[in-house]
Design a protein with these regions (language model features):
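N-terminal leader/targeting segments and the first structural element of proteins
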Residues: 1-5
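Acidic/histidine-rich alpha-helical segments that form the ligand environment
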Residues: 7-31, 78-127
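Secondary-structure boundary/capping motif
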Residues: 21, 47-51, 128
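Conserved alpha-helical segments that form or flank metal/cofactor-binding pockets of metalloenzymes
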Residues: 35-76
Length: 128
């Protein structure tokens, strides 16, 4: 598969976003106080590494197959670590990390939503 210059640039930009997410979520897994949140950030970082790798494969001309019906989060039911009235520094730290994570994911998903229209190949669009 031969990519256009615009497609190549879009994939490289997305890889940059994924690399930033990997670094952020790895750091957040170390900073989080709640053990389940630590594990969640580790899991998200691993998923971002997979995204980064699949974008690299696409840049090299091979589009990996993907499951467009990803349901792994469907059964995620973490137990509450903090109480509603808890105003501890640990809770505030974890709240900041989660809020920033959500904002980051919204930003990056917006990039994917825009960049999907750059590609003519339906397999790459599925990947994104």
């Amino acid at each position: 598969m031969v990519l256009t210059q615009k497609e190549t640039a879009a994939l490289k930009d997305l890889q940059t976003q994924e690399q930033s997410c990997i670094e952020k979520y790895t750091r957040y897994s170390q900073e989080a106080k709640d053990p389940q949140l630590k594990d969640l950030f580790k899991h998200i970082s691993t998923d971002e590494q997979k995204h980064y790798k699949s974008l690299g494969q696409a840049l090299n001309g091979t589009v990996p197959s993907v499951d467009c019906n990803d349901t792994q989060g469907r059964n995620y039911q973490p137990k509450a670590h903090y109480t509603p009235n808890d105003n501890s520094p640990e809770k505030k730290t974890d709240c900041f990390l989660v809020t920033d994570c959500i904002g980051t994911e919204k930003l990056v998903s917006g990039e994917y939503n825009s960049d999907v229209f750059v590609f003519g190949d339906s397999d790459i669009r599925k990947l994104l």
